[in-house]
Amino acid sequence: MRPPGFWSRPPTHPLARLLAPAGRVYGGLTANRMDRPGATPPCPVLCVGNFTLGGAGKTPTALSLVRLLRELGRTPALLSRGYGGRLAGPLVVDPARHAAAEVGDEPLLLAQAAPTIVARDRPAGARLCAASGADVIVMDDGLQNPSLTKTLSLAVVDGGAGLGNGLPFPAGPLRAPLARQWPHVAGLVLVGEGGPGEAMAAEAERRGLPVHRARLVPETGSDWAGRRVVAFAGIGRPQKFFETLRSLGAEIVAEGAFPDHHPYRPGDWTALSALAAREGASLVTTEKDAVRLPAEARAVVDVLRVTLAFANETRLRQQLAAAFPHA
């Protein structure tokens, strides 16, 4: 879904006030659900979640955590609900065989780095992770899902967006009241800079939680300086992607902002191709969008790849080592 504009306005906005009663009900139900005890998994669980609906940088965070766990001698597998996919699982994602419409876009990206299980039933998915040889499970999203007991939960926050107006859905982007969510996390991953994120960092530190600051770094290999591009993205914050391209020197002649997890259809591709041809520009998108494109499109669209770089990776490594000691 595309976040409505009033979510980033003050909570006194008329639409926010109108929807606030529904938000109190939704947020209260979600918070009560979070407090329920979960099933004991066959191996420890590291949950990568966020306080809000929409993108915050969970996927690159999960990929970085997989790398760090391996460096600590662990054998991680990734567990995802498979948002946007029609298969309920549990199943092992095979990028050569599965499409985004089947398993979701994020699992296809995750599966390039480590064994990835899609399962609507998280406990069943955890059992398949263990059967696949994992000794620790990295759960992509699921902070508000109580079905599994988590060893460690990290909340990812977009530094520029923060928590929007701070209200629960549908009045705002929060999945539950923030005060009810804090007790469920053991640390904050702050992606990017911005006043909203710094306010969250200050609150986390006041609560005695570590704050792991990070930024998305474009991978080298392509020279974007001076290139005319038609940039398009269906992610949580498309403008963030466009800003990154501009920072690399690309000349964006047209932007296409689609809802998060948008399933690209032939008509979308035809329109984008025609626009690029008219402008004498190349098409560029994100890794997450690329896996949702038709096969013929993936061959001709440029992809901006990014990795997550931590300001103090040692501190995060120490937290992981304490939570998941190598036997």
Swiss-Prot record:
It catalyses: a lipid A disaccharide + ATP = a lipid IVA + ADP + H(+). The keyword Transcription does not apply. Belongs to the LpxK family. InterPro entries: LpxK, P-loop_NTPase. GO terms for biological process: lipid A biosynthetic process; lipopolysaccharide core region biosynthetic process. One of its GO terms (molecular function) is tetraacyldisaccharide 4'-kinase activity. This is Tetraacyldisaccharide 4'-kinase. Pathway: Glycolipid biosynthesis; lipid IV(A) biosynthesis; lipid IV(A) from (3R)-3-hydroxytetradecanoyl-[acyl-carrier-protein] and UDP-N-acetyl-alpha-D-glucosamine: step 6/6. The gene is lpxK. Keywords: ATP-binding, Kinase, Lipid A biosynthesis, Lipid biosynthesis, Lipid metabolism, Nucleotide-binding, Transferase. It holds the Pfam family LpxK. PANTHER family: TETRAACYLDISACCHARIDE 4'-KINASE, TETRAACYLDISACCHARIDE 4'-KINASE, MITOCHONDRIAL-RELATED.
